[in-house]
Design a protein with these regions (language model features):
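Non-catalytic, soluble scaffold/interaction modules
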Residues: 1-224
Length: 224
């Protein structure tokens, strides 16, 4: 039986390579209350995670070749600015101090509140920008939860010549793909105005978005 999957080509080109599937762990965010004497340590833990997230993004920005399209750096800079934005960072700190929530849960509550605001926007393009919030918050949460880096984020990753398959990609993921000489990528979600599509065109990497179930029906190292 032949199975056909359909998506939207958003960047020109043809590529053949073995598949590498990004399987992001579903982050299990704990919810608990801390003791009054733990508040300072918990706020410090969140601030340290934010600082490390900035450090990671600056390192990724440093991988952008000088000859690359100027459209790329602003995507990383946007995420860096969000990490400095009081709207994202100060409310979780307040929740830690006032309600004595753990850092992960306080951050999740603020993420949900901000996403609700974006969901109510009439402009379809602006609604999709809630993905920026998810990408930034997920980076902080992975640090707080001490999650292992994904393979394509590891400095010694050997992915040259691979085709990356993922549910979605953050701008930082897309930049690292070029750094590791990944030849193409496929995402299950996204459209022609998504970050993934815009960056693929800027980086001149063949790409297909919106190919639902691509990860489910592809095995690691399949020739694609």
């Amino acid at each position: 039986m032949t199975l056909s999957l359909h998506g939207m080509g958003v960047s020109r080109g043809i590529a053949i390579g073995h598949a590498h599937i990004i399987e992001r762990d579903r982050l299990d965010i704990p919810e608990y209350h801390i003791e009054p004497q733990q508040v300072d340590a918990e706020t410090g833990r969140l601030l340290e995670a934010i600082a490390l997230a900035k450090q990671q993004l600056r390192a990724i920005r440093g991988h952008i070749p000088a000859a690359t399209s100027p459209d790329i750096t602003p995507f990383i800079d946007t995420h860096l600015l969000m990490l400095d934005d009081a709207v994202l960072t100060q409310e979780p700190l307040r929740l830690i101090r006032s309600a004595r929530y753990n850092a992960e849960w306080a951050l999740l509550l603020q993420r949900d509140a901000l996403v609700d605001v974006f969901d109510e926007m009439e402009d379809a393009y602006l609604r999709t920008r809630k993905n920026d919030i998810d990408h930034v918050v997920n980076r902080i949460q992975r640090i707080l939860l001490k999650q292992k880096p994904l393979r394509h984020e590891e400095p010694d990753s050997r992915l040259s010549g691979y085709i990356l398959i993922a549910d979605d990609l953050a701008p930082a993921d897309t930049v690292l793909m070029q750094h590791h000489s990944i030849v193409a990528f496929v995402t299950e979600y996204g459209g022609p105005t998504s970050h993934t599509a815009i960056l693929a065109r800027s980086l001149v990497i063949p790409a297909i978005v919106g190919m639902h179930e691509a990860g489910r029906f592809t095995r690691e190292d399949d020739l694609s």
